[in-house]
């Protein structure tokens, strides 16, 4: 075919109906204006009713135009078993399996598509799997491509090398590597096996394009290798002639990172005494440190091991040994530079760094839970992504203020009155004033008052008549609320709360969230989504009828129930129950709440939130469908950035702070982690959008700790002993919070 014609408006693919143009997932999307055809390459390759009957230069890659039109017409009669829309051109090749689906839907449902031979496709029930022995270790290991942790579990997202039994990959990492390397360079990253490795990856659905590697197709791809990196990347460069100045055989000679070679430093800037001394950049030290953390296994420490500062951080003491006091634990931790700075590997390297490198640093590795599951880690990544999106939406907020007068004893009505007042604008800065002081914690910043207001408001909405269900809730049908447009107001309040720094809802059911972001017509409910126990029990009776006579008897007994749902129909076969159950579920879970759902969706469109939810479903699912994790010492540690002057003993001060967080988390303190956060920020939890400004810690020559809620800054005293530090912390925090509650 002649040169492709591309349509700027990106029409949908004629096979799957999706407008997405993502070559990595769906193949190249091409539009042929003269034939009025737009196709994803993978949708065409995987379609079950079409073959390449032409030469490579005929039609579309050998697929004749008339054959493509016939396949489109055939698919138009087939409904996708996943999204319930027409155009399902791909069918499972397993015998007796009649499932059909679109290519993008199949990817989401974790189907396997084999890009070889007959281009077979397998549904989520019949897809090929890798066999894992029960004797194998279930401890997570590193993906050899991205170096992140990967669970040793039979999951769609996890693949194991057929040639190296201890080599594991993320499916996504393998797919991107295959697309880049092509059939000539795609091989096992450990042993370089090509044939056996490619055969297994093709069987498991990895697409290996028949092309040369991307780096071989680029002109002068290796040109950069002919140049040596000559730049000092140390935060505080001491060279008066600039970062690019390089004088061989002097202290101003630039030395490159021994691991990556893409970062450099003057010898003097990193206190390197001679050229022979090794040096690694911050990024490489962080990667190696994380790798060593993940590979260590917890075991009891021998007495000799207790003297090793590095081991002390990574291992837990044996339960058979006497428990160390907080002071002795801190002495042990102090010997490990990983506690002080995550990018140092040698105990003395902290002192060799320039002062500016020690002014601000994260202490999160100190408390890192190395047994954290991948699911929790993934959830944290999603919440971080959602936080960044909310910060983008917050840019709409201007400096003009709108005051809300809130009565905590009647939170809903006072909030409703404030949101409906004539001068209320979601883009204005919200200032909250509580009109009743009884049983209320006073806050000295409007941020704290606003956070408390949104917290109380979310609790009220969660437990209101607008929702039904236990912990994971769906919308209910409240005619009076619908008449008063309260569903719209609730959606609007949630949107405003998230963008203005309020807490995450965390109580939505998966079915409700899917209806909001995908549309109710694209969602298939199940029995677990039915909130009414009586309705669920009736549907179960129909679903689990084992004979035609028992099914007909159950239908007769449920005559009024079926009539109310519009599902009365003659039952002539036992197979009729599946369609009946499906229609009942759609009615009671989705159709019944269509009006409240649409009103609620309109409210969520405030400040552009719903649009972002539709674009980033996974990220916002973590906020709407999952409760936030309990506040931990790790989270609190990661939240604060330490700032101090050069003359402060940063090591000892930070050590006291970390030891105190550990004591508080383990219950060895009269205050809680929530008390500490409230003392500094006026908030009892970390909002999804984060804090503005970001919380900081300063070690200053003050007598007692000071919490500056306007700046989210915690000023800590410099003490000689940990006990003195702990006593001052607890006395000040308890006294301050007690005074605010009185």
Curated annotation (Swiss-Prot):
Keywords: Apoptosis, Cytoplasm, Developmental protein, Metal-binding, Nucleus, Repeat, Transferase, Ubl conjugation pathway, Zinc, Zinc-finger. It is an enzyme of class 2 (transferase). It comes from the Eukaryota. One of its GO terms (molecular function) is zinc ion binding. A zinc finger (C2HC pre-PHD-type) spans 10-50. One of its GO terms (cellular component) is cytoplasm. It is found in: Nucleus, Nucleolus; Cytoplasm. CDD domains: ePHD_PHF7_G2E3_like, PHD_PHF7_G2E3_like. Its EC number is 2.3.2.26. Pathway: Protein modification; protein ubiquitination. The keyword Nucleus applies. PANTHER family: G2_M PHASE-SPECIFIC E3 UBIQUITIN-PROTEIN LIGASE, PHD FINGER PROTEIN. E3 ubiquitin-protein ligase which accepts ubiquitin from an E2 ubiquitin-conjugating enzyme in the form of a thioester and then directly transfers the ubiquitin to targeted substrates. Essential in early embryonic development to prevent apoptotic death. Ubiquitin ligase activity is mediated by two distinct domains, PHD-type zinc fingers 2 and 3. The use of these distinct domains may allow ubiquitination of different targets by each domain. The HECT domain is catalytically inactive and does not contribute to this activity. This is G2/M phase-specific E3 ubiquitin-protein ligase. It comes from Gallus gallus (Chicken).
